[in-house]
Amino acid sequence: MVREKAQVTMGSTTMDMLEDEVVKAQDRRWRLRLRNPWACSAYTLVTTALGFAAFFLMLQSFLTKQLDTKGCEMVYMRPMYSKFDDFDTEHTRFASKYSLYLYREWGIDEEFTVKGAPVLFIPGNAGSYKQVRSLAAESAYHYHNSVQHESNAGKGERRPLDFFAVDFNEDFTAFHGQTVLDQAEYLNDAITFILSLYHTPGRSRRDPHLPDPTSVIIVGHSMGGVVARTLFTMPNYQANSINTIVTIAAPHARPPVSFDGDIVRTQNAVNSYWRSAYAQDSAKDNPLQHVTLVSIAGGGLDNIVSSDYASIASIVPETHGFTVFSSSIPNCWTGADHLAITWCDQVRKSIVRALYDVVDVSQAMQTLPVTNRMRFFKKWFLTGLEDIAEKTLPMTTEATLLTVDVDTAILPQEEQLVLRSLGRSSPNIKAFLLPVPPRDRGEKIFTLLTNERLDGPGEHGRLEVLFCSMSSAQSTQSYLTHLDFAGESPTATKLACKNAASDVIILPESTSHSNFPFRPDQAPFSYLQYDVRDLAQHQFVAVLDKVAHHSAGWVVAAFSASSEATVKVNPSLQRLLYTGISLQLPPRRPLTTEISIPALHSSLLAYDVHISRQKCSQGELFAPLLRQYISDLYESKFFVNVEDAMINVHGRGRPTCRAALSSKSPSNGLSLQIWADPTCDSSIDVTLKVDFLGSLGKLWMRYRIVFAAFPLLVVALVLCQQFRTYDATGVFISFAQSLNECMYSSLPLAITALTFLSITLATAQMQSKKLQALGGPASIIGAFFDNDNELLLGSEDPFFWFLVPLFGIMCTAICVMVNYVVLILTYLFATLYALVRSNRLLDASGQRTPDAFAVTSTRRRIINTLILLSLISTAIPYHFAYVVLCIVQLATCIRGFRLAKEAQLDTNYNFYNYAHSIFILMLWILPINLPVLVVWIRNLAIQWLTPFSSHHNVLSITPFILLVETLSTGRMVPRVRPGISLFTNVFLFAIGAYAAVYGVTYAYVLHHLANILCAWLVAIHFDTLGLAFEDSSKGVAVVGGRSEGKKRP
């Protein structure tokens, strides 16, 4: 009996031991799984694969799809520069850092004395003063060859343009707000010095009867355009010393990067200053009342600064400036990349000719009044087809007396004039009169297209167009020109006429041999378009064929109903995406047809357009010509001899860009204007479809900053899961395992919540715009809900809700990649570290012993920290210290990984996983600090040692220093009580939420949020407030390989 009881007891004990072993084995497997740094679940693997597939498709689309053709002509010049050495420290405190130069063109103007109107060129980010040479050389040649021989009739008195340029030693203004302010201060001093040259004996050869200049014309490239607008906000700005600014590829709407707080605050302050100035009720209260600003953008070829940011619609009213794309500029018609736009021959010629037209050296301000300046800027930079384009016909005098035989010259009402070959008309019929229809017959437009240049008053060319009315009884001597096409006809009638050449619109030539609109060897078309209301004072349109012999010139002209010339397609955006647009233009149609699609206004979508070729029995006069345009930024693109065209736009719907001022007319979306030969009696099929793959590439230029900010949301959620598990179980799981767990819990919830938030914000933004458009009290309510497109991805269309999960997947994939790259580097460096120290880690018996963290004395650590902080407060920016801390933290990770592998203790693995995760967090904060560090290093290279006060704030780096220094001793963070762990979650949630909602616009704040988190972790480490468990000190300090804790199998 006793024996049986003993056997039962032994069996029970054995079973208990077996159960304990099973539990221990399960616990070991659980701990092994949680601490595996290479863990990757199937869900994580699929998400990573999808993320990288989308990312590489986006890059492939950006590099190969929907690309504009490069059409800039190369330029040549023979530059000469003169440095103003006497512009020294007596004039500016930046004399040792920056320099001022005067440009002259060798062989044209070699005298380094001022003689005309001053123009100051401001280079952009890392730009050179030598970039002025293309504009200045063209200015010298244009004045030498043309301007000095032209009449000043209708214009101001003109002299050569004196081009000055500043050498900023290739400063990085895009990264550093203080550099922008320094350059602005220097430029104001330079302007004062430049103006003083014009009344300095020996420096000026200006005509004595001309007044001394009191203002300078500014041309700014890239960030130089932003600096130009900053000049007005500086204390040393001299009132009215600037009244004309032309910027090229300048990011006016937003800073190109938001990693530096100073650049964000500076540009926001400058934009607010300009908005408030133009918002004044009285012109006397507006310090910018005499200032005009034209912003020229390069379009899709600019891969450095998105041309969306070149918009000044939210800063300057249309009365004082506008934004235009180089593809819209007459005789240019091509996009340009960020650097090419400074030397592009077509662009520089338009800029120089516009500047000469607005110059008036007889005035002290050196320019014409604002209204005249704007008229000439519109003439040179806009197509002439825009709503704000001004017609000069009403202001033109009747300078031509035309005598015609009305019996043979007048065409029947509503008949189309077609001259297929100029010079073939009967000798008795050289003038063709189209009767202007009465206004009571509905809305009409007059259009005329020809491949010939239209003659101006008194010119003896090949074709002239006049708008005529019956001559009054005034003397014929008052007319400048007399044209007699009637001979001895008894029905001769005299008509008083105005010449239409000043309103001609230049269009690129489109024939069956045309390939691109910007070919310099092609003569452009001449186009006229008037609303019949503009012709109310006239009875006839006279087309004069002045060619004596048969020629290849042709003319098409007619009055047509406005309703026939406009087709409005207004389906929803969703329907357009699924089915596209298909429509047919009838055989009998006007010369030009405009297709308006209000739903297509987003710059995030790209489209493919196909236009079928029409059949012509007599042959086409010209091939179809397509113009795509969007009125928000006056962006036009022309496609000649078109069958297939790639359409992409900039404008409304652009992310993180503020809406236009109230004076700006609402957008009509994408419009397609087609010129097709109306003599061909055949229909034209037009189809438009969304290019989904091409659209994907548009995300890169608009959302590059997302890939620096959004991953911090993922990192914050991973850290939150790690601390939650550690405080509950004592196991600090690996970053990879925590990411796996987040894939099933917090990450999908966060992305879903952000998706709904994006829909809510976009809907509120749309409603806000509608309410503000109504005016009155509704506009006040609308302004309250207006978020200026600063939140999340900045889109104002709820349709793009899918961008949040799309970027969430891509950023998660990037986080996975970065984690594994860091692991690989840690493994490689740890292996190398072990090989170097292998001979030093043998005990007395020759056996290897685990490596140990070297623990310095507290006094020495305090001294080192104080020395570093003193250097930060005086000599080095905290961004430099942050980079050093990242290197130190990487070394800590390497040592922690090696120790964990050798000691195989749970506490060592806890510490390594903790140190690794902190390093991942610091690594994602690193890009925010690098740009300012680059600026500091650049200043050291040019021996500029003046510190920037905003970058020596020790509080911005002290928590990072203390945390990294603590981790370098191998000290593990203690576990905290459940109530206290809530604060850790709150700090991490704040980082993640801010990164997602505000990270794109205010990325620099993420450094400070991470700094606060570090301060909290330092407080937990030192446990000065009793935050940790009472037994938290047991097994948490990693001191060599003698740490307590469970040993891993």
Swiss-Prot record:
Function recorded in the entry: Involved in inositol deacylation of GPI-anchored proteins which plays important roles in the quality control and ER-associated degradation of GPI-anchored proteins.
One GO cellular component term: endoplasmic reticulum
Classification via PANTHER family: GPI INOSITOL-DEACYLASE, NEGATIVE REGULATOR OF VESICLE FORMATION-RELATED
InterPro entries named among the record's database cross-references: AB_hydrolase_fold, PGAP1-ab_dom-like, PGAP1/BST1, PGAP1_TMD
Keyword Calcium assigned: no
Tree of life domain: Eukaryota
Chief location: endoplasmic reticulum
Organism of provenance: Phaeosphaeria nodorum (strain SN15 / ATCC MYA-4574 / FGSC 10173) (Glume blotch fungus)
Record flagged with keyword NADP: no
Keywords from the named record: Endoplasmic reticulum, Hydrolase, Membrane, Protein transport, Transmembrane, Transmembrane helix, Transport
Positions of the catalytic residues: 222
Protein name: GPI inositol-deacylase
Similarity annotation: Belongs to the GPI inositol-deacylase family.
